[in-house]
Every structure is written in C-alpha cells, then in structure tokens.
C-alpha cells in the first residue's frame, strides 16, 4: 500500500478525508482554544502554519468527524461535559489568507482585503463597499455575532507577507501597507466582545513599529516552551510516524536505517524555538526527502530574500559570526525594525538562525544555523553578493574548487581564490575603513571554504577579532569555529590552528592567509610551522600540504602563494 505523505497539503479537511498521514498536533489546539483568546505565532515559511490554521477552522466549525481517533476527539467531549455545554459547537469563522497575493504591485493588498470582505459580507446580508477596509471588517464581525448569536473566530494566515514582499524593494509601498494593516488589525481589539478566538500567523513580528501597537491584547506564543513543538516534526514524531519512509529512503540511498536517520537530522533538524524546547525538523524538507527519496536542499528553492543579503552588506556584518556566534537578548529576538542594523531578529524569525545556546546568567541567546540545509543554502546565496560569481553559478564555482583540491592542483585552486578576491567590489571605503574592506576579502574566503564543506571535509577557524598574531591573518577579524560536512562544533586544541583546513582522502591542506597586506607568503608558511598548526593532523597518516598566501593592497588581491609538503 502506498503511503500518502501530505507534502503541500494545507487543508485539514482534505488531509483527513483523503487518508493522508497526519502527525497529531491537536493537543496544542485544545490547549489554545481553552486558555487565552488572541494569539500570534511566528514560524519560518513552509513550517506547517497554514495546515494548523486549517485545523483550527475545522474545530471551530464543529467538524467532529475530521478529528476521529485524534487527541482532540476525546478531549473536547470531556471538556464539554465538565463545563456543562454542548461539544463541537459551531462558530462563525473568518479566514483571511495573504498567501496568494503578489504584493510588489501597489493594488495587491487592497485586492486581497476586498476579496475577503466581498466574499464574507453576503453571508451576513452586508453591502459596505463604500467604507474603509477596517470599518467593513468591524461591521462584518458585529453582523456575524448578531446573526448567529455566537462569538466570531478570526484566523489570519501570513499576516506579514505584504510587508516582507515590499521590504527593501519599495519602501513607500511598504509604509502604506504598514499603515493600512495597522488600522485593519486594530479592529480585533475594538471588537473584543464579539470575538471567541483569534489566531494570526506570520514569519516576523513587526511589533513596536506600529502594526501591533494597537493590538496589545495579543499573546505571542512564538517562544513559549509549551508551544515549541506546535509546528514542525520532533525526533519522536519522526521515528514514530515515518519509520517505513526512513527505511525506503535508506534503501534508495544505499544507507543503513541509522545512517539515513543521522543524515536527516544533519540536514533538516535543529530548529529551536525555546532554549528548553525540543529540536524541530523542517516538515516541508523532511516530507520532500521522503517523497523524492533524496536528501538535498528543498527549503531554499526560492532563494534568500534580496533585502536580507543587502541588509547584511549595508551593516558590514561579519558573515562567519552567523555560524554560532550571534548573541541577542529576548527583546532582540522578538522584535524587528526594517533597517539594516536590525537584520539579526528577522534572520532568527525567518528560520535562517536558531537558538544554539542560552546564557542564563546574562539572559542572552546564542544563535547559529540550524542545519546543513540552511547553512549551505544561505551561504550559497551570499557568495555572488560578495564577489563577481554570477547568481545561479555558485555551485559550479565551488565544484571547480573541490575538483582542484581533490586532484592536488594547488596552483589552480589558489588562482581561483585570487580571482574571487580581486573581483570583490571596492565599495569606496576610505583609508579609515580599510578594516571593512579587509573584512569583505575574508568573508569571500570564508564562503568558499565553508561551501566546499558539502563535498570535502573543511575547517574554517575564526578566532578573536582583536587578536594580534603578528601577521595580519584571518584570525584578526573573526571568532568561533565551524567544521562542516559531518560536524559543526567548536574544538579546543593544544596546538594553534590555521585559517582554513581541507581534508581529502589522502591529503590534508593547511592554509594561512595574510589578507591585511602586512605579511608575505613566506611569513604565512613560517607561521604555520612555528605555531604547530599541522601537529594535530599528523596522526591521520595523510600527506600534509602547507599553503601560505600574501595579499597586496594596491592590486586588492593575493600577490603570491607558496606551497610545500610537510616532511614526515
């Protein structure tokens, strides 16, 4: 029998009636429906928000048959008996979906709101087309309550899509949308007495910038521990519900069951929405891997939003920090303003970064990439922004680097690195900002080596920004450590560490770059030897190649490099 996996299914009714596999999330629904009244949930795109809203709609429409054998079936009956009311009561449900609009067009928001109101008003014998959207919404809620004698349920899917699609693209239109949505959503507060339940979902929380400033009765559950598992798939849910699919994937990829499980975890797990919560798998990527029987990047098929890349560049943000060295407090995580200096909160809310550690005594969250799918997908989209690598060609360029290193072609490899660095835009930095220019060089080198980690084992070591090793190496501009391919952790060494290390089947390549222009290739080689960078690799029994490179500021590229084999 073919297992029906719900890839792309967003209708709870369709999912249940057509026999698709369903991971029961109705305990969360029951808890929400019987506690607070107006909720907001922020989760990354393709994380199951629309399906959960559809499930809420089915519950509040009293569609008992759809919940057969689920947690909610028994819980609703017991709760109703305890409260002395009828179970499965039907409420008027107003469902506003922003998913379908193309909001770069100036009339798109008006079209979406008008369609919603034009569709709902006739159900309650209303005709209010001459009024503003906010006033029409108010009249609709009041009429639904008065004509059914039931409080209204309001569900809003992707409330922020009009703002995200215009951010950094058309700021004038973005501000217009912001003002209109503020007025529209404020109705939820003014009509509080007519509302039984309201649930808004989105990617970001445009909190104190105005949208929700009037909606102060909103409960944000985005980082509440008890709702951390509401969207996405936990490890237990994966192994309980998808065991046959994991085995099929393993057989197709010539892996053992445990190897397939480990690969899925490495690629799609790692999202944490509370420091004490459980890690979550991206459901879209997980289901895609099972349906297509291949582990690869699915979530990044639409690419990284251009405004995020632009904001990171405008803020001169040091890209290696994103892999585990970002720190924010709770307010920083949950609010967002559309300026370059505040890019990190939206990177977290949109799923590009997640909680890696909570520093309790300082109340700080340490963030990093959740998994390989996000790490490589994000960095893949950044390389063209920091070099002249054409968009859509990152994979080809990285493939050439990998082929060179596998074939032992050090000169060809370094010529490619030289070309990447020399192509970096000058950005009109003044002499006072030479460090920012140097940072762009280092970012490009970091991106190349980090992206190679998909195919060969690489280590990109970055340490204290203010450290002085006497040679102006990459260690001056970064901190932390990211080891890609099969690991992502910080290692403590008794010996020193080089800027970059690449391991192939038979060779370890140790690189040291003098990117600030105050050291030669010979100086870099001397530093590798003097600081014992190769010591930790000698036990592998592989050939060890040392590569030192010197930078020339006048030509803004690598002037020279030297390579030599370490004698055993």
Predicted feature locations:
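Phosphate-binding site recognition
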Residues: 1-437, 447, 452-453, 464-468, ...
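Conserved catalytic cores of phosphodiester-cleaving nucleases, focusing on short active-site segments
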Residues: 445, 470, 500-502, 506-517, ...
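Mg2+/Mn2+-dependent nuclease catalytic core
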Residues: 174-179, 515-534
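Short beta-strand or tight-loop elements
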Residues: 441, 494-498, 542
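Short secondary-structure junctions
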Residues: 449-456, 539-541
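Domain-level recognition of nuclease-like catalytic cores that cleave nucleotide substrates
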Residues: 536, 540-568
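Long, charged, glycine-rich C-terminal linkers/tails
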Residues: 357-360, 454-463, 488-503, 512
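Feature representing long, continuous alpha-helical segments
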Residues: 439, 443-447, 508, 526
């Amino acid at each position: 029998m073919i297992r029906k996996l719900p890839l792309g299914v967003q209708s709870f009714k369709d999912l249940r009636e057509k026999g698709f596999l369903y991971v029961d999330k109705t305990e969360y629904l029951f808890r929400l429906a019987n506690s607070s009244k107006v909720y907001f949930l922020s989760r990354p795109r393709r994380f199951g928000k629309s399906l959960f809203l559809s499930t809420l709609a089915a519950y509040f429409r009293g569609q008992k048959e759809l919940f057969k054998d689920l947690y909610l079936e028994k819980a609703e009956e017991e709760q109703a008996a305890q409260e002395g009311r009828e179970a499965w009561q039907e409420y008027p449900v107003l469902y506003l979906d922003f998913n379908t609009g193309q909001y770069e067009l100036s009339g798109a928001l008006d079209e979406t709101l008008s369609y919603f109101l034009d569709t709902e008003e006739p159900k309650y014998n209303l005709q209010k087309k001459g009024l503003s959207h906010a006033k029409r919404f108010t009249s609709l809620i009041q009429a639904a309550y008065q004509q059914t004698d039931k409080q209204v349920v309001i569900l809003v899917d992707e409330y922020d899509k009009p703002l995200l699609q215009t951010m950094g693209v058309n700021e004038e239109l973005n501000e217009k949308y912001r003002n209109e949505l503020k007025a529209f959503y404020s109705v939820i507060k003014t009509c509080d007495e007519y509302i039984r339940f309201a649930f808004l979902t989105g990617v970001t929380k445009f909190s104190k910038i105005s949208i929700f400033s009037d909606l102060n009765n909103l409960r944000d559950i985005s980082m509440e521990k008890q709702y951390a598992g509401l969207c996405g798939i936990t490890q237990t849910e994966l192994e309980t519900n998808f065991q046959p699919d994991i085995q099929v994937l393993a057989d197709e990829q010539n892996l053992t069951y445990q190897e397939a499980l480990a690969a899925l975890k490495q690629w799609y797990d790692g999202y944490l929405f509370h420091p004490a919560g459980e890690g979550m798998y991206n459901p879209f990527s997980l289901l895609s891997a099972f349906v297509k029987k291949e582990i690869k990047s699915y979530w990044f098929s639409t690419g990284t939003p251009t405004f995020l890349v632009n904001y990171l560049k405008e803020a001169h943000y040091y890209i290696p920090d994103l892999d585990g060295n970002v720190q924010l407090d709770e307010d920083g995580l949950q609010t967002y303003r559309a300026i370059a200096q505040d890019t990190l909160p939206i990177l977290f809310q949109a799923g590009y970064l997640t909680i890696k550690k909570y520093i309790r005594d300082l109340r700080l969250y340490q963030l990093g990439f959740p998994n390989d799918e996000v790490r490589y997908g994000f960095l893949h989209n950044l390389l063209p922004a920091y070099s002249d690598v054409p968009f859509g060609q990152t994979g080809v360029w990285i493939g050439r680097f990998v082929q060179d290193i596998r074939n032992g072609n050090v000169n060809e490899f370094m010529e490619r690195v030289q070309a990447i660095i020399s192509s970096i835009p000058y950005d009109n930095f003044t002499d006072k900002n030479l460090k920012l220019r140097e940072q762009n060089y280092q970012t490009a080198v970091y991106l190349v080596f980090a992206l190679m980690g998909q195919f060969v084992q690489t280590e990109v070591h970055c340490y204290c920004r203010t450290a002085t090793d006497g040679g102006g190496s990459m260690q001056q501009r970064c901190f932390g450590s990211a080891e890609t391919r099969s690991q992502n952790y910080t290692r403590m060494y008794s010996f020193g560490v080089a800027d970059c290390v690449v391991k192939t089947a038979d060779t370890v390549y140790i690189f040291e770059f003098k990117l600030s222009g105050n050291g030669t290739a010979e100086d870099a080689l001397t530093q590798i030897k003097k600081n014992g960078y190769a010591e930790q690799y000698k036990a592998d029994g592989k050939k060890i190649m040392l590569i030192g490179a010197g930078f020339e500021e006048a030509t803004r590229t690598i002037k020279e490099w030297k390579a030599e084999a370490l004698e055993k």
